[in-house]
Structure formats: C-alpha cells, structure tokens
Amino acid sequence: MSESLLIILGDGPTFASAIAIAKRAHPTSVLRTERLMPSDIANTTMDFLDECDPAMTSVFAAIGMHALNYARFDLWAKLRLRGMRIASLIDPSAHVDPTASIGENCLIESGVSIGPNATVAAGTIIQSGVGLSADAKIGKFSWIGMNSTVGAGAAVGSHVVLGAGVHIASGVTIGAHCEIVQPGLFAKSLNEGTFISPQFTEPARVYRVAAVSPASSSNLMWQGTP
C-alpha cells in the first residue's frame, strides 16, 4: 500500500511554519515541499501534481502574511480546480475543542486554544498563542496574529487581518476585509473594510473590494479614500 503524501506549496515564514507543523503532526506521512512565490501563482501549472495519486495525496497552500491572504486564496482556488484534496495543519500543542469546526487549508500554530462550537473557515492562518472563545467565528482566508484573542460569540469576517496582541471583545462583529494592526482591546463592531493602525487616532482608510478573481489576484481592485 502506498504511503500518504503531503505536499506543501509556498514561500516565506508561513511556508516554514507549515513544514515544521507538518513534521510534528504527521510524522508518518511523506513530506514534499515546493517553493512557490506569490508572483508565480497566476502562471504556475503545477504539472508535478499529475504524477501524484489523488487518493493518497493532500496539499497545503502555505502563502501568507497579511496582504498575501489574497495570494493564498488564488493558490487554493487553483488547487480546488485541479480536484486536489486540501489539508489543514494543526500543531499538536494546540487545543481544538471537539465541537469546533476547522475548514480546509487552515494553519493552526503552537499554543492556540479554540473553544466549543468555534468556527474557523477555510484558508485562515492562526498564529501561536491565539485564543478563540466559545462560539467565536473566523471567516475565510483571514490572518490572526500571535497572542490575539477573539471573545465568545464574536464574528470576524473573511479576508481580515488581526495583528499581534489584538483582542476582540465578546459579541463584537468585525466586517470582511478589515485590518487591525494596533494592539489592544476592541469592544465595538467595525464596518467592512475598516483599517486601524497606531498611525491613526480613529478608524481610517476605509476600502471596499470591487472585484476579486479566484484565478488571479492581479484583478483585485480597491475603491475608496487612500
């Protein structure tokens, strides 16, 4: 019988983190790594996947950090179109409640705690030391920075970036495409596209996504006040 094969595609810190977690979490699987820069995603054919047994192969799109949420989405979409089985990687030191739901192509790093009935949608990266309380929800292709927390019943939308040390209070809603890079407690809900940085004294730089192509992030268009 063939051994299971795990292929990790990507580059940068997320790529390195995914490889380390895969070695700890799946020591009996054959691990193959393929470096792929975000700028190469639109043109890559990934022909090497044709040589793999689909029944025994899982893949993980390990491209990340903040604005690269969209590049990770593009790579995931190409893998889905090829009919590949897509893995999630969870560090053995993380605690995931049995009632929690983790989507495909999620990376859960060391020391993470995910509470009862919490939901983490596809493509999301959760860095080390993050805590998600009961019934918390994280949308697709988001990035949750280290030592951040999301309170009970709080909802974080898709394509959101929470920087390190950001704490979302219970019951708060963070709209899609928000970026919060200022550490601290956020007890009020934020509209879609809100950007919060230490450079500003109040929420600023509101953007709205006009179009997102699953085939290429080059078709990503932003509208709003810079």
Which sequence ranges carry the predicted segments?
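A generic local structural motif
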Residues: T45-F48, F73-D74, A94, V130, ...
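Extended, small-residue-rich solenoid/repeat segments and analogous flexible loops
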Residues: D50-G131, A136, F141
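Glycine-rich hexapeptide-repeat left-handed beta-helix
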Residues: G145-P226
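Short secondary-structure capping/turn micro-motifs that flank functional sites
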Residues: P38-S39, H95-V96, T194
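Residue-level detector of alpha-helical recognition elements and their boundaries
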Residues: T33, M37, D74, G139-K140, ...
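Terminal amphipathic alpha-helical/low-complexity segments used for targeting or macromolecular assembly
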Residues: M1-D91, Y207-P226
